[in-house]
């Protein structure tokens, strides 16, 4: 029999249906010659630092850097039962071969391989590589299974990425958390992304607006401008000089221009436009596209390609017809699609661009949630636009001369609306006010024409600061980060991947380093402080983009994983050495949230409220009172802040409601600190006489 392992249950069900594995079991489906099971995402992950040495359970500066000599992996606790199912199936004597059917990409490969290795499986496996969950795509995929070894380099790149994130995250987070006594999460990709938010916020906060003036002259429907005059006095002088005077059309230039249709959607571009049009976060869009993929209505979402392959031409034509029939917004659209525009085999690696599927023909679109309908409309609109006709217009540039001053204006006249007609139809459905096109149609004039008695006016303007990032513009910045560091022959990958960028943004928000205000993403005070204290090698988008490029080269077999990780380890070690201590003032940078409850009985330093504990602020002192320590837990009590304060103040505290298994009733006692300076603080109990 053949064991097929998918990434999640819904995908497994789609595959099982095609293979005829319809008999449901505990954690898998069986039928014919197949058993189909699933992973629930990451079942096996890199072990936490404390798994290597129990002393790492407590965060200490002196333990850094932590770099495993031999990497350990552990089963995710809440998914242990499914791992047992998979492990047992892999060892089942009936199973002679496996099929890796996790998502066709770097992370999907890692999910399967870690389970395969952790289970100690050595049976041969094939790889299912598909871009759609339609029945026809699954059948075709199983007819063209590939040898699993063909993806060894993909796995190597995925594992290298995971290890690099572990090394930078564990050491960077522990280093700055122990130095500043506040949990400061540092990430290989997360931190440079935060740095971009902070840099933009800094430019906005230090921006000083400057006033300038524009002078306008015109007659009838024709008005031209002299822009960016520095002073009001000069602008008024120019206007006064031109008022009621004669202006001559000194220059007239007409040029026919075209705007090519946009490319198809990759994930990042789809996330950007969903944010711009609907206000969806990157994560919301990814979740919606993933759901539509699992419903077989969209192709694979985590793609970085905006093209399809030439063997998809007939399918693309079919899908375009289905979009016009099934999506009411486009029911009146008549198109003659140019499929060649979106076809390029050389620009499709793992997956082609995101498209609707032919399964859309069978779907009652109105029965879908509104959010899913919006994504389908967006993807459908882009497919029709991308294969539509060019937008053509005539641009006219006119210069007016008046009293030795030159005033200019531009106008446009649409010749063929082309693909923009579909885009305008889509935008009209949103019922949101679009910005007026600054270039309007101009009246018919000729070079040398004279305008008698023109009117003149002055308007006041101010320079504007940069805009705060939205998820749209941040995704764009992440995608192009560090591009100027590479030569023209290097394929640029930016910060993160299409699959990970949404999660990175969410982590920044959840960790309290960034916040959403409307559509804007703004760094918090802690976020700004964190970027200020971190060195450039951690905050530099260019360096992280270079790492991402190296991972891609590992995947292609052009770079060595060990060399890459050695560089990460070296950088991390240098980082720790660069921060041997902080001044008291610097250590208080994040200190506004720290609460002192007493003095340390060992060294006299302040004792602060921590996460689940009360710790000595002196890094050299190990004194710490844990809320859930063995002594208090055995008596079904928690060491509260009130108790901790009294223990530090008096050395003892009267505690009520203590439990003992020997008696049914609770009792009271005096708890004393019995600290001998060891690793753990001890207590002793006294009773009233």
How would you label these PLM feature ranges?
Residues 1, 99-104, 181-183, 254-263, ...:
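Conserved short loop/turn motifs at secondary-structure junctions
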Residues 232-265, 271, 542:
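Metal- or metallocofactor-binding catalytic centers and their adjacent structured scaffolds
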Residues 2-3, 90, 118, 173, ...:
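Basic, low-complexity terminal or inter-domain segments flanking catalytic cores
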Residues 9-16, 33-36, 40, 76-87, ...:
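Amphipathic alpha-helical transducer elements in NTP-driven molecular machines
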Residues 221-223, 253-254, 324:
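Phosphate-rich ligand and nucleic-acid binding surfaces
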Residues 1-162, 166, 465:
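Intrinsically disordered, low-complexity regulatory segments
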Residues 93, 135-217, 254-258:
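C-terminal or mid-to-C-terminal helical accessory/interaction module adjacent to the motor/catalytic core
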């Amino acid at each position: 029999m053949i064991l097929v392992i998918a990434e999640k249950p819904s995908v497994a069900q789609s595959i099982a249906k095609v293979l005829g594995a319809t008999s449901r079991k505990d954690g898998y489906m069986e039928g014919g010659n197949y058993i189909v099971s699933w992973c629930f995402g990451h079942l096996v992950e890199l072990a936490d630092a404390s798994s290597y040495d129990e002393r790492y359970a407590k965060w200490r500066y002196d333990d850094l850097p932590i770099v495993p000599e031999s990497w350990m992996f552990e089963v995710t606790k809440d998914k242990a039962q499914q791992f047992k199912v998979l492990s047992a199936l892999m060892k089942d004597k009936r199973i002679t071969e496996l099929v890796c059917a996790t998502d066709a990409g770097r992370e999907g490969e890692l999910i399967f391989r870690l389970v395969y290795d952790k289970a100690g499986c050595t049976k041969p496996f094939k790889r299912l590589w598909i871009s759609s969950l339609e029945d026809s795509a699954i059948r075709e995929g199983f007819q063209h299974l590939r040898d699993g070894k063909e993806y060894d380099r993909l796995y190597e790149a995925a594992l290298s990425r995971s290890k690099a994130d572990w090394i930078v995250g564990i050491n960077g987070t522990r280093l700055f958390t122990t130095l500043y006594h506040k949990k400061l999460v540092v990430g290989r990709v997360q931190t440079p992304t935060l740095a971009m938010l902070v840099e933009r916020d800094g430019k906005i906060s230090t921006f000083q607006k400057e006033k300038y003036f524009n002078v306008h002259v015109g007659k009838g429907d024709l008005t031209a401008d002299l822009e960016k005059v520095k002073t009001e006095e000069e602008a008024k002088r120019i206007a006064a000089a031109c008022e009621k005077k004669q202006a001559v059309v000194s220059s007239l230039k007409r040029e026919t221009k075209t705007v090519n249709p946009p490319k198809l959607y990759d994930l990042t571009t789809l996330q950007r436009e969903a944010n711009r049009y609907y206000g969806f976060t990157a994560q919301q869009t990814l979740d919606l596209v993933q759901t539509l993929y699992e419903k077989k209505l969209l192709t694979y979402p985590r793609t970085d390609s905006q093209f399809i392959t030439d063997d998809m031409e007939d399918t693309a034509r079919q899908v375009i017809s289905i979009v016009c029939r099934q999506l009411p917004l486009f029911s009146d659209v008549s198109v003659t699609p140019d499929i060649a525009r979106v076809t390029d085999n050389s620009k499709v690696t793992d997956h082609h661009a995101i498209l609707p599927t032919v399964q859309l023909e069978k779907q009652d679109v109105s029965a879908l949630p509104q959010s899913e309908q919006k994504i389908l409309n967006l993807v459908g609109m882009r497919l029709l636009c991308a294969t539509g006709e060019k937008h053509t217009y005539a641009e006219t540039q006119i210069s007016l001369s008046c009293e030795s001053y030159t005033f200019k204006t531009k106008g446009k006249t649409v010749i063929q609306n082309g693909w923009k007609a579909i885009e305008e139809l889509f935008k009209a459905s949103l019922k949101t006010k679009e910005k007026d096109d600054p270039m309007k149609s101009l009246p018919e004039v000729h070079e040398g024409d004279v305008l008698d008695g023109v009117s003149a006016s002055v308007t006041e303007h101010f320079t504007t600061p940069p805009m705060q990032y939205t998820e749209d513009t941040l995704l764009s910045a992440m995608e192009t980060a560090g591009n100027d560091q590479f030569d023209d022959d290097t394929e640029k990958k930016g910060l993160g991947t299409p699959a990970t960028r949404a999660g990175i943004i969410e982590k920044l928000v959840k960790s309290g380093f960034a916040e959403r205000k409307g559509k804007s993403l703004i760094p918090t005070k802690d976020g700004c402080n964190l970027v200020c204290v971190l060195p450039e090698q951690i905050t530099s988008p260019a360096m992280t983009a270079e790492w991402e490029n190296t991972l891609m080269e590992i995947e292609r077999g052009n770079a060595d994983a060990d060399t890459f990780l050695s560089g990460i380890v070296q950088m991390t070690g240098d980082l720790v050495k660069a921060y041997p201590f902080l001044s008291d003032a610097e250590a208080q940078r994040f200190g506004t949230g720290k609460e002192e409850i007493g003095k340390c009985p060992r060294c006299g330093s302040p004792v602060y409220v921590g996460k689940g504990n009360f710790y000595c602020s002196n890094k050299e002192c190990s004194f710490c009172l844990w809320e859930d320590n063995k002594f208090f837990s055995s008596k079904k009590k928690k060491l509260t802040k009130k108790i901790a304060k009294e223990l530090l103040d008096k050395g003892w505290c009267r505690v009520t409601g203590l439990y003992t298994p020997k008696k049914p009733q609770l009792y009271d006692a005096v708890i004393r600190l019995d600290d001998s300076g060891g690793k753990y603080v001890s207590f002793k109990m006294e009773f009233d006489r």
